[in-house]
Regions:
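Hydrophobic anchor residue at the start of the ABC signature
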Residues: 126
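ABC-family nucleotide-binding domains
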Residues: 140, 147
Length: 190
């Protein structure tokens, strides 16, 4: 379980989160709000990449996160297959390849990640996060750049590979995510 208690965070004097509280237990959550409201800031606080100005963040000691950031952070010079096997030493190459080909064509397995299109890179980043050995998966705007068909397949892939872990997705587009528990971020000061 991850809990945020009255968390506030400002940047350059502008308050982004103001006394925000939420509890994330096992299962899936959709962190909702319009673009620029503070969803990514909330994620960065949960991950410990930012510190709150006020409030408290409670999470289990040693919790392992798998993250798909808004910007694809892939090993561009490595193959698609290596990008996935590198984050989980327990996964067999055949299992990784099978999972990858649920979202990407099989002829991409041995291509360099840097050679993929933007949408393919996004799907690879999601596969890598979902196959990472973790307790909590965080996907920050995972559907950016995906057409409707790729989005639908990616949502199904995420749900299939959740395996009882905590999932936090940020998205301004809720299509296909109505079974996730919604956590709303309101404008700071409201």
């Amino acid at each position: 379980m991850i809990e945020l208690k009255n968390v506030s965070r400002s940047f350059d004097g502008k308050k982004v989160l103001d006394s925000f509280s939420a509890v994330f237990d096992k299962g899936g959550y959709l962190l909702k709000g319009p673009s620029g409201i503070g969803k990514t800031t909330c994620i960065m606080l949960i991950l410990g990449l930012l510190k709150p100005d006020a409030g408290e963040i409670i999470k289990p000691e040693g919790i392992r996160f798998a993250v798909c950031f808004q910007e694809n952070r892939l090993f561009e010079k490595e193959t698609v297959l290596t990008n996935v096997t590198a984050v989980n030493e327990n996964i067999l190459e055949a299992d990784a390849a099978s999972a990858i080909t649920e979202l990407l064509p099989s002829d991409t397995l041995n291509k360099k990640a840097g050679a993929l299109s933007g949408g393919m890179k996004r799907r690879l980043a999601v596969v890598r996060a979902m196959l990472h050995d973790s307790d909590c998966v965080i996907l920050d705007e995972p559907f950016t750049g995906l057409n409707d068909e790729a989005r639908t397949k990616t949502i199904a892939f995420i749900k299939e590979h959740l395996n009882g872990r905590l999932l936090i997705i940020t998205s301004h587009d809720e299509r296909g995510l109505n079974d996730l528990r919604a956590v709303h971020i309101d404008p700071a000061g409201d």
